[in-house]
């Protein structure tokens, strides 16, 4: 009996160790469990597939409201070199999409504060998404301007960005696709100057059960179908819907931002449209 108990105990320890190893070596891709080293390329494949229809995709996934959410984020940050200042800001927009946030921040600074000196680094891991942003830039006041640069970078590392170099770090609808979200937050903290602001806009968890039921019905029933009809790409839209459900809830994500070293004011987030999306803010002290 003693020997049997010892064998059971040993087996339990082995299973526990194996479970930890499994947890360490694997991650989620939507609802699928995959090796961590495969996720980056799978996510790249999704966004290469949807790059040319990226704005349409966000319209479908948010019923068009993402444009209002982005406008609200930009106005909430209210960034720009003030007329009595000689220090332009250095922005970093990660997982840039087609540049909504990047161009919006520069527009806000220019139109509200007359700021024509602040600079913007636009970063994305996916070269197809970067090309979409570059094409869109050609129709903005920042076309061929030295004030804006596009970089192909992994948001979890940002190897080309020096420590303590950026004033504002923004990321919209991108961080949930990271393999290691905490590593991405740690990197955001690294590249920001003391006093710098981290701002994240991301799909989140609806806080009303009845509304959540309706939202999930819309998400899982209609979104993949519309992806098939609009972009001939059901699988990418299915992944994007599932990735929202796998993303941490508002409180958990706020605590992850704190864990990266940021001061998080108040409860740490602002729900938008009943929690369909949320804005998270952190300050590097």
Residue ranges and their predicted role:
Residues 14-45:
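N-terminal auxiliary segments of SAM/dcSAM-dependent transferases
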Residues 53, 63-89, 104, 108:
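Conserved alpha-helix/loop element of class I SAM-dependent methyltransferases that forms part
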Residues 89-158:
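Class I SAM-dependent methyltransferase SAM/SAH-binding core
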Residues 156-169:
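A short acidic, Gly/Pro-enriched loop at the edge of an enzyme's catalytic core
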Residues 167-181, 204:
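A short SAM/SAH-binding and catalytic strip from SAM-dependent methyltransferases
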Residues 182-197:
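A short glycine-rich, Lys/Arg-flanked "PGG" loop and its adjoining helix->strand segment in the class I
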Residues 204-260:
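C-terminal alpha-helical "lid/dimerization" subdomain adjacent to the S-adenosyl-L-methionine
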Residues 261-285:
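Core SAM-dependent methyltransferase catalytic element
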């Amino acid at each position: 009996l003693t020997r049997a108990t010892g064998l059971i105990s040993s087996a339990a320890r082995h299973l526990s160790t194996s479970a930890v190893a499994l947890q360490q070596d694997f991650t989620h891709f939507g609802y699928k469990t995959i090796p961590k080293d495969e996720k980056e390329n799978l996510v790249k494949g999704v966004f290469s597939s949807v790059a040319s229809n990226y704005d349409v995709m966000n319209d479908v996934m948010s019923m068009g409201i993402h444009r209002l959410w982005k406008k609200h984020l930009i106005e909430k940050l209210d960034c720009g070199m003030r007329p009595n200042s000689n220090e332009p800001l250095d922005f970093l927009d990660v997982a840039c999409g087609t540049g909504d946030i990047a161009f919006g921040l520069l527009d806000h600074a220019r139109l509200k504060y007359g700021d024509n000196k602040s600079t913007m680094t636009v970063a994305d891991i996916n070269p197809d998404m970067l090309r979409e942003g570059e094409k869109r830039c050609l129709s903005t006041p920042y076309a061929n301007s030295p004030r804006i640069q596009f970089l192909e970078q992994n948001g979890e590392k940002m190897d080309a960005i020096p420590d303590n170099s950026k004033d504002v770090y923004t990321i919209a609808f991108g961080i949930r696709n990271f393999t290691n979200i905490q590593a991405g937050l740690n990197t955001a903290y690294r590249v920001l100057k003391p006093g710098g602001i981290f701002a994240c806009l991301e799909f989140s968890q609806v806080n009303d059960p009845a509304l959540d039921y309706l939202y999930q019905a819309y998400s899982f029933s209609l979104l993949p179908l519309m992806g098939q009809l609009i972009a001939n790409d059901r699988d990418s839209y299915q992944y994007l819907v599932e990735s929202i459900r796998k993303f941490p809830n508002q409180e958990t994500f706020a605590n992850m931002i704190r864990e990266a070293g940021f001061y998080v004011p108040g409860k740490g987030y602002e729900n938008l449209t009943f929690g369909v999306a949320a804005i998270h803010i952190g300050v590097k002290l």
